Amino acid sequence: MKYKSIGNVETKYYQIPEELVLESGKKISDVTLAYETYGTLNWDKSNAILVCHALTGDAHAAGWHEGDRKPGWWDIIIGPGKALDTRKYFIICSNVIGGCKGSTGPSSINPDTGESYGLDFPVVTIKDMVNAQKKLIDYLGISKLLAVIGGSMGGLQVLQWSVSYPDMVKKAIPIATAGYSTPQQIAFNEVGRIAIVSDPNWNSGNYYGEKEPTHGLALARMIGHITYLSDDSMHQKFGRRLQDKNEYEFDFSREFEVESYLHYQGLTFTERFDANSYLYLTKAIDYFDLTENNSLAEGLKNVEAKFLVISFTSDWLYPPYQLREIVMALSANNADVTYREIESNYGHDSFLLESGQLNYVLNNFLSHTYVSDIMIEDIATIKEGISIDEAARVMFEKEITHLPLVSSDSKLVGLVTSWDISKSIALKSDNLEEIMTKNVVTARPDEPIEKAAEKMESKDISALPVIDKDRRVIGMVTSEDISRLIEEF
């Protein structure tokens, strides 16, 4: 099936009003974030999904810019009818700080000097990127994200979001990524950086307005691009075919198709990316490590999100064992986690190319709504011993029709409704326990919303207190919430 694109889009810009304090302790002012949004934010701002880009990505994740020859880098996933359906969700994607596609980075103008930062730009980390994104999300007035999703370096950001802001992320989807950078990953990044700094035109990062280190950056891209492919995909794409010739030349010219391909990838990359940004972003990847006391489980102990962790069989840059390690760490903390290992020959680039399988897996996870996704968390309750008059006053002031009665340790004892209050007046009763419901029908936060709806329909009730495993009241879900969900999605 062919799906529509979202059409033409524009990049927006947000300037953080205060200084951004970095993990290194340094501060940077006048930070700008380039971002794009797709879809419509609903009235209670509960349908927002943050998409985090990979090393060489940007804010342009979907749709078309005027004059573009191709759409945004994840157009296969974002748009009407796709997993990130813009008819349902409000999608946000921003360029990371340290980047070169509109957000503040080493190629930006340093307000103190009036010239490009170059290496005066402070080193940033994945945590710094996420903290900057948090400023943007606050600016958009969003208190909780329905999901945060990203592949590769984007997956690192997803994991950092779940650790730094656990109460802001309902669903986390890290793809083709890791809980920490391995020595092999760091080694590949270092070779790329050496290629750049060895270019005479790099000039210690002060090349803006001069000849740029295109040779070094192209070589770094060629090295990196090899790690994004797989042996199978290279066999299928190139084999041992020669480029525009039938016999060996017995010299050192480019003879094989794969050689021409890599040179083309390197050359075109230099036209859209900044060499210093490549240094900064790969360094941020190297520093990424969520373990505490050499334990990833310890580092992920405070996460609250539901997780979908996705790997690809042929990915040797972020191999499946690293994604399974994330799953095991989450499971050790009793986190709600689903793991999917997708069969693919595309290597690490699978997350950008596997449209069919990835859309299917993502759609199944995102469209499965649980009670915790729509329940009202900050609800009023009353304690045992309260009078009917006091209960009625709470209902009136809070403009609610259902009021859970709880014990001193917040465990559910009963439920008082506005109907019960009316009944007490008719019966001239002043004993709350006589008129309240004692055998309360409840919901659990991890229940599918369909099950909660069935309970309401079968019992002819309009609200369910949500309780945890110890019967403590943690929220309320109403028929109105469910009806609104159906209307929106």
Curated annotation (Swiss-Prot):
SUPFAM superfamilies in the record: alpha/beta-Hydrolases (SSF53474), CBS-domain pair (SSF54631)
PROSITE patterns in alphabetical order: CBS
Binding site for substrate: R221, D349
GO molecular function list: homoserine O-acetyltransferase activity
Span of domain CBS: 375-434, 436-489
Keyword Transmembrane helix carried by entry: no
GO biological process: homoserine metabolic process; methionine biosynthetic process
Active-site annotation: S152, D315, H348
InterPro entries tied to this protein: AB_hydrolase_1, AB_hydrolase_fold, CBS_dom, CBS_dom_sf, HAT_MetX-like
Quaternary state and interactors: Homodimer.
Protein's name according to its UniProt entry: Homoserine O-acetyltransferase
